[in-house]
């Protein structure tokens, strides 16, 4: 999860169609240009995709004391977030390593995850496909759990609840991406075109697939 967060930070430069690749960091600044659909709306950071990575990134940025004066927009294509059923288990789960565990604790989501439903991994066995070689990791070999298994819906719900407490992060549902361009070589801004015709601009554009 942390690896995905690091890979998705994209910054703009000359106009180019959206594609992979990182561009140099530059200072973020806030510019207000109105909120009507006919005008460009400017944000410091736009995150496309409200899955686990996108919401965790938005929450982490919003709770960063150095970025509290920056406007962050999270775009989610779904019509809204549905709270998971406590009684019904989901078979869509993720293994949370210690880096992701620290991230969840830092943004305040881990305590709720623990209260809802979680299972620690106490033993792991890795073997070679072409031989009988294998290695086993046991809980007894470490001072902490190897990792934790968490349902995706439980993790997402906990992070969304933390997002509700962050004033500088805006969430838009039913926001589907039609096109976007990145800026290169000193051009001013990245642009995001939504399917409803809205045009958004930003200093930093992050696109998530998870």
Predicted regions and their residues:
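A short, Lys/Arg-enriched amphipathic alpha-helix followed by its capping loop at the start of a domain
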Residues: 57-70, 103, 204
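Alpha-helix termini
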Residues: 32-37, 62-69, 166-167, 184-186
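Conserved N-terminal helical subregion
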Residues: 116-210
């Amino acid at each position: 999860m942390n690896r995905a967060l690091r890979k998705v930070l994209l910054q703009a430069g000359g106009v180019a169609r959206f594609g992979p690749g990182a561009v140099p960091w530059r200072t973020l600044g806030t510019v207000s240009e109105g909120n009507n659909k006919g005008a460009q709306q400017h944000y410091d950071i736009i995150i496309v995709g409200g899955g686990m990575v996108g919401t965790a990134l938005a929450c982490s940025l919003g709770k960063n004391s150095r970025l509290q004066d920056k406007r962050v927009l999270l775009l989610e294509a779904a019509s809204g977030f549905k709270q998971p059923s406590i009684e019904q288990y989901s078979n869509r789960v993720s293994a949370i390593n210690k880096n992701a565990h620290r991230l969840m604790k830092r943004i305040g989501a881990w305590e709720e995850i623990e209260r809802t439903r979680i299972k620690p991994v106490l033993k792991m066995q890795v073997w070679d496909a072409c031989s009988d070689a294998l290695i086993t990791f046991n809980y007894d070999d470490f001072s902490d759990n190897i990792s934790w298994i968490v349902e995706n819906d439980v993790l997402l719900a906990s992070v969304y609840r933390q997002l509700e407490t962050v004033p500088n992060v805006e969430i838009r549902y039913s926001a589907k991406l039609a096109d976007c361009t990145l800026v290169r070589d000193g051009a001013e801004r990245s642009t995001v075109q939504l399917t409803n015709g809205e045009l958004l601009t930003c200093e930093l554009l992050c696109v998530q697939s998870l």
